Amino acid sequence: MRNLFAIVDRERADAATTSISLDARLGMLYNAALRLADIALRHCGYRAGHERQHYRVITSLPFTLGNDWKETTRFLERIQKLRHRNDYESVGLATKTQVDELGKIVEKLQTAVVDLVR
């Protein structure tokens, strides 16, 4: 799990670079959130299958961290769709507000996951 936490740290550090696009920063923060959700899922003894893996990992948060994470899960699902559009259909869709909000969520999520695995 140490390597997964290292990926999270790298993604968060890279996303803090303001000279890259908001789309790229959003993608990096989403990847960090996805890794954190995966760490929590693995800690609880599960792994998501390959089919709809991102969806399954993200939607596992209320089960691994508690029902307080339901709204965060919905937000991350919206971000996943936006990230998909940014990667495959368009550019310039991410806003600074979304990036900032996702950054705060990732910070909170990392704290919760670190507490879980202790």
Ranges and model annotations:
Residues 1-118:
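Terminal alpha-helical segments
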